[in-house]
């Protein structure tokens, strides 16, 4: 869990920004949104399959883009 100790010179806004940045890095908000509703394993697998396909297509695109420069 992220925690921020505010310094004497720091305003509340600065400390809040630091806390938000730490929470984003730890994916706390994203995980809470994902766990808000029950998701069956079939839906999880479907999402994983879609994400894997996107990742593969992106790599293929970057590889072809790089090869065209050679």
Swiss-Prot record:
Pfam families (UniProt xref): Ribosomal_S21
Ribosomal protein as UniProt keyword: yes
Highest taxon listed in the record's lineage: Bacteria
Any GO molecular function: structural constituent of ribosome
Keyword terms: Ribonucleoprotein, Ribosomal protein
Signal peptide limits: none
Gene Ontology cellular component terms for the protein in this record: ribonucleoprotein complex; ribosome
GO biological-process terms attached to the record: translation
Family affiliation: Belongs to the bacterial ribosomal protein bS21 family.
HAMAP family reported for this sequence: Ribosomal_bS21 (MF_00358)
Protein's recorded name: Small ribosomal subunit protein bS21
Protein encoded by which gene: rpsU
């Amino acid at each position: 869990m992220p925690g921020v100790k505010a310094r004497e010179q720091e305003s509340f806004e600065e400390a809040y920004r630091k806390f938000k940045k730490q929470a984003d890095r730890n994916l706390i908000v994203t995980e809470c949104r994902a766990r808000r509703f029950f998701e069956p394993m079939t839906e999880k697998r479907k999402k994983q399959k879609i994400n894997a396909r996107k990742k593969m297509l992106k790599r293929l695109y970057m590889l072809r883009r790089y090869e065209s420069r050679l």
